[in-house]
Amino acid sequence: MTNNSGNNSGNSNNPRTENHFDYVRITLASPERIMEWGQRTLPNGQIVGEVTKPETINYRTLKPEMDGLFCEKIFGPSKDWECHCGKYKRVRHRGIVCERCGVEVTESRVRRHRMGFIKLAAPVSHVWYLKGIPSYVAILLDMPLRDVEQIVYFNCYTVLSPGDNSNLFYQQLLTEDEWLEIEDETYAEDSKIISEPIVGIGAEALKYLLKELDLPFIGDGLRQEITGSKGQRRAKLIKRLRVIDNFIATGAKPEWMVLDVVPVIPPDLRPMVQLDGGRFATSDLNDLYRRVINRNNRLGRLKEILAPEIIIRNEKRMLQEAVDALIDNGRRGRTVVGANNRPLKSLSDIIEGKQGRFRQNLLGKRVDYSGRSVIVVGPRLKIHQCGLPKEMAIELFQPFVIHRLIRQNIVNNIKAAKKLIQRADDEVMQVLQEVIEGHPILLNRAPTLHRLGIQAFEPKLVDGRAIQLHPLVCPAFNADFDGDQMAVHVPLSIEAQTEARILMLASANILSPATGEPVITPSQDMVLGIYYLTSSKPAQTQPAFGERGLTFANTYDVISAYDNDRIGLHTWIWVRFSGEVEDDDESEMPIKIETAEDGSYTELWRYRRERFDKDKALVSRYLLTTVGRVIMNTSIMNSINAN
């Protein structure tokens, strides 16, 4: 099993003081450490902790059975400040151990962290280290996994000491028949064997083999062997050396991979609750623990009455399978199922996966001042803005709104403010608008694979229930608008708001931190829209210069005519333009030059017409272009001038 430890720097005198840890260490736990977790000495000197009975609760009194899986003596009282028999009630009896039932009078929440243990009648192998990938037991013993399994599950004997028998060697596998033959030879009348061979079977034999390993000596030998080997053999040696070095570095012993003691997790983490109809719903772990205790107790009784070896061996195998199912149901052998043929959830199932303890409860905690909604495109937003639904904003910023309502003397207390907020008056919306002004929010899209997966935006109140997102920031989030959801978080402190505004604002994250390439690049319908806006219809006839309705004095007249539906998006027009022009005209000379009597002249190009005075100073320039290109150019120029 694993052992979590750290340096506690908290004040241990006060039971309510939180424990502060410098680090968490996860290593193999020794049998003594597992017993330490569960064993406690009560104030009266009595030692408790071992769970010896498979019972959970008494179905008449509905109270936990003593020495069972929910025992109050081991795990603490079910009700605050009340012992099992009811002799002591109330907080004034804190710390007293009842003389009748032996339960310490304390808070019931201790049942969330007090552990117990089951002392096994025979050692069992830990299924993670036996059947895991890679199998650490097989690597350490330098044996095939199949052979190790044959030993653990009582299919084959292994030679622990060959004795004087020259036909045997250390760790050799023997079937039942082969061992019987060797026994007959060893104990025959004419036998010359003085030192008898010793064989073992089951987890006991495995524990012996692991205990005999001299890790530093084996490590030195492997290092020498690695220098002279290559290919697959070298890779195998390195893998074994790495495991050995880890054991040496952590101070763990290989035999700890075989369990003599099984920890029992606190009862409130595997609860049993009564349903409406009087029936009980219980955690699957209780069934798995019950199987282990039943088989363990049965094995203990069989050993006491000196039952035949074959029966004891079968019971040991069943105990091994029960512990396997408890630790990792389905890893080996037949999966243990409950009602409706549903596989029971083991300790591993509770820890691993998306719904496991780490990802669900420790890494992915629910936080206050956060929300979640579907995202839709907000093309009218600025790049540093996002559309926040009013319904969501009023909930997220409620404390700020209440504070401002009271400060502005609109209401007198929090209760009145909440009533006003529920009605969603215009007054409230006005205050909300003031609150969110300049208060950035964080948007996050899972999975957050790089730092641009969470960015800050200025919220803009919008109707509806969807968050509006600027289309250009989608590549950074790897988001699209086919039903993606995003989470909203509100930075509360001034420091957090400042950090969000300076470091995390979307307009400050234009380049990818990984490659230095721009991460804000238009794509899909943005590119298509720009293409459609600036494309032309070659077949359309181009107007003559000065043609009525198609020659304009400036770009604003063009946009005004388009807005009034007098011209289309792809209509060819002449427009006067005073800015710089970069022409991609292939010919370097104008098509035609018209000279006037006063010495002024006009150059005619394919897409432009320029008039100069006699001193060659530009008088006017008209461009032949489309309405869409004028709109595009004006938008870009306005953005540049605004900045």
UniProtKB/Swiss-Prot annotation:
Cellular location(s): Plastid, Organellar chromatophore
Function: DNA-dependent RNA polymerase catalyzes the transcription of DNA into RNA using the four ribonucleoside triphosphates as substrates.
Cofactor(s) the protein needs: Mg(2+); Zn(2+)
Keywords: DNA-directed RNA polymerase, Magnesium, Metal-binding, Nucleotidyltransferase, Organellar chromatophore, Plastid, Transcription, Transferase, Zinc
Protein name: DNA-directed RNA polymerase subunit beta'
GO MF entries: DNA binding; DNA-directed RNA polymerase activity; magnesium ion binding; zinc ion binding
Family that this chain belongs to: Belongs to the RNA polymerase beta' chain family. RpoC1 subfamily.
SMART domains in the record: RPOLA_N
Domain of life per record: Eukaryota
The reaction(s) this protein catalyses: RNA(n) + a ribonucleoside 5'-triphosphate = RNA(n+1) + diphosphate
InterPro entries: DNA-dir_RpoC1_gamma, DNA-dir_RpoC_beta_prime, RNA_pol_asu, RNA_pol_N, RNA_pol_Rpb1_1, RNA_pol_Rpb1_3, RNA_pol_Rpb1_3_sf, RNA_pol_Rpb1_clamp_domain
Cofactor comment text: Binds 1 Mg(2+) ion per subunit.
Enzyme class: transferase
Positions that bind Zn(2+): C83, C85, C98, C101
